[in-house]
Every structure is written in C-alpha cells, then in structure tokens.
Amino acid sequence: QRQMCIRDRMDQTACAVGGVITIDFKDPAHPVVGQTAIDLAKHGFVMCISDTKGSHADLTDDYAAIRREMESVAEQFGKKVLREVDEDEFYKALPKLRKAVGDRAVVRAMHFYNDCRRAAQLCAAVREDDFETFLRLIIEGGHSSFEFNQNAYSIKNPKEQGVPVALALSQRVLNGRGAWRLQGGGFAGTIQAFVPVDLLDAYKAAIDGCFGEGSCHVLNIRNYGAVPVTPDM
C-alpha cells in the first residue's frame, strides 16, 4: 500500500509541477521536488506514449517483488533500504549476497545504484540542454530496466510481451535518431519514446499497426504545472 501511495504521488506531482522533475523520497512524508524546463520542439522532437494493451491483472506480486528483493539486499547490511548501503561495500559482498538473496535481487540492486546515478545525469543533461546525452541516458535507463530490473514482462505469462514488442518496434524505427524505454512500473501498459518530427508518421504507423489505431499518443512536455483558473482569465 505504501509503495502504491508513493507511485501515485509521483504521477500527481509530475502533473502538478510540470517540466522534467526529480523527486527524492528519502523522507516519504516530505519528498523533495526539483523542476527543470525542457523544450522538445526546439530540438525537433515530440514525446509519444504508446499503449501496448497489456493487462495489469495479477501483477501485484511482480511489482512487490522488486521492492522486496532490493530490501532483502539492504537487510544483509543491517539497513532498511539500498540508499543506506555503500555501493562499494555492496560489490565487495557479491559472493555472499548471491547465496543469501539470489541473483535476481543482486542484479536489481545493481540497477538501483546505476539508475540513481543516471537520474542525476539525466537531469543535468536537461539543465545544460545537452539533448544527445538526454537521449542516450533514456535508452541506457530503458535497457537497464529491461535487462537488470527485469520489469518488461511478467515471467508468469511469458507469451504476453507487449512492452518488449513495442520497444523492439521503437528501436527499429528510431535507432540512431530517437530514444525509447518502458514507462512506469513496467510489466505491462505503456512505453515512452522521444521521436524526431520527421519520423513521427512512420513511428505512429508502426505502433498503431501492431497495437491498434490510436495506441500511439503524441504529446509534449508542458513546463507549467497546475495553475488556478478564474472567471476573469
């Protein structure tokens, strides 16, 4: 329940603040939020959110396992969460950790350390208007989620892999030009892609052709969040 609450806060905060945001949940009761403006149009890009039509039914255990396994690693060091565990100490303890918590927990912890670092680099790239680095980090983070966090599909239903299919299509159309990755908690649902305007028609055709008309939603990132609307405006 607490995990779902934090995830919901992330969605609501992103909408309320606008732009590219960072949220530090070190103190879940008082998260620290940062904001950076981004201008996709300036670089000739749009953002696409594509619905892979997957079902989120029976995925509760998959979502919960990610947190449970990362916390199991932290417990080996007498800590509650991984951010309290020194990364170098984690790597020194790999032989012990593999036996104690299993390999999936270990590689998910590796993803945690790398992705926390990547998030800071991504935010810096946006602030510095380094769009090439921004795209590269989006792709790197997506690969890490797929390969190491292992949340692109549920192992309980390996025949249903809509997210990987959408990612593979995205790579086919955008390789060398844009960026793509799974979105949110993963396992099913949506992916995001940053698409050059000149490739938008081809990208939409590929996604809609696979998942159905209207599956690819073309968006922009609004740099203004929630604003008051009054009758005199």
What are these regions (language model features)?
Residues R2-I6:
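Short, small-residue-biased leader/transition segments that mark boundaries at the very start
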Residues A14, G19-R181, A193-M233:
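C-terminal nucleotide
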Residues A188-I191:
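N-terminal pre-core extensions flanking Radical SAM catalytic domains
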